[in-house]
Amino acid sequence: MTALKLPSLPFALEPAGSPPPGCRVRSGVMTLTAAARTDMFVDPAGTGPVPDAGRFVGLPPAGDFTLAAQVSVEFASMYDAGVLLLHAAERDWAKLCFEYSPQLKPTAVTVVTRGTSDDCNSFEVDGSTLWLRITRSGAAWAFHASTDGAWWRLLRYFTLGLELVRVGFLAQSPAGAGCAATFDHVTFRPGAPENLRDGS
């Protein structure tokens, strides 16, 4: 599978992981289709293999930035999700997810993996669309979500402890037969909000 170039991104997106997701790009809108039983989660209980779901990631320019997208997911099975991803190494990465919870509710979820993964469910969403945003601010990362693309709720503020971090997109279906996630209104902006906690 070849690299992707979205008009709004100043870097190419390279395929990684296995099996590769299905991918369609039309007018700057990207749809990824996850294969069955695909995930990225390193269970802190130490059970199961280290998953390596197919994804598209690229190396952003140096400095602070925000990467945002309106994410729509065709939910069918629990844990189906569309994801904005940070990836530094096999066991050093983080996910900002719009995910189907075990209660079958669309939910904003974050996962930070440094050796093993944590798992943090944030808030439920009415509908199948949510705005997600990644921010790099110095050595730190921030995950935000928004129901309207205007007011942003801070979900996580953390570091991966590594300088070389790729960013990108993922669809997952850990418990299901596959999942399609669409990423619309993808934007990349240099700089970070002055205040990560005031909704801007």
Model-derived features: where do they sit?
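Extracellular glycan-recognition regions
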Residues: 1-200
